[in-house]
Design a protein with these regions (language model features):
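Contiguous beta-strand/loop segments that form the cofactor/metal-binding neighborhood of enzyme cores
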Residues: 1-202
Length: 202
């Protein structure tokens, strides 16, 4: 499991320990005084930290594992991602009947909804998640451990359930959402060249 936290406020400055390169730790973040806390929840609200654990399977389910969004725009205060295949990923709770799940994703189809997170899969109606896959439909293999899956794939040469390229695309999409939020305007993105075409500010 995991959690998403709001960033903590920095406390009063303290001397930086000799074994810590504080400038390197801050990276591109604004310069701030060291306050004794280098915890993982200092700068984010979970989108890059916890969000990509959910966004990788959103991209997989929408057939976008090896690409990225082409448009980003805000609606109802949340960033939304539009893909070339016509799918739009809405960065907010889907209105309507609750389907369960805790901070994951809700897939909306013509016959129902399926909510999935790290611990559960819930559907409305319940029968939507019980329909068996037919021959020829994609069957994802199960893995209970990323590290165990990686070691198994080293031995078998099978592709990991979430390899570096997939992780890159999931993290990139969320980074793009951060740029869209900072600029406060819609953006176009070229997922092949990985650039904002004709938009130097972005």
């Amino acid at each position: 499991g995991g959690a998403i936290f709001w960033p903590k406020r920095f406390g009063p400055g303290q001397p930086v320990p000799n074994d810590l390169d504080w400038d390197l730790y801050l990276g591109p973040a604004p310069a701030l005084p060291y306050d004794g806390d280098t915890g993982p929840h200092r700068f984010d609200i979970g989108e890059l930290n916890w969000g990509q654990h959910h966004y990788d399977f959103i991209q997989w389910a929408t057939g976008s594992d090896e690409t990225g969004p082409v448009e980003l725009f805000t609606a109802d205060g949340c960033t939304n991602y539009k893909y070339t295949n016509g799918v739009t990923v809405f960065g907010r709770a889907y209105p309507g009947e609750p389907v369960g799940g805790d901070g994951g994703a809700v897939f909306v189809g013509t016959d129902g909804r399926i909510a999935v997170d790290r611990d559960a899969l819930v559907s409305y109606p319940a029968s939507a998640a019980r329909e068996p896959l037919r021959p020829g439909e994609f069957h994802a293999y199960r893995s209970d451990s990323h590290s165990g899956n990686f070691l198994d794939c080293v031995r078998t040469q099978k592709r990991p359930i979430c390899d570096a390229a997939i992780a890159h695309r999931a993290a990139s999409a969320l980074l793009l959402g951060g740029v869209e939020k900072q600029l406060g305007r819609p953006l176009r993105w070229d997922p092949v060249r990985e650039e904002f075409p004709g938009d130097d500010e972005a």
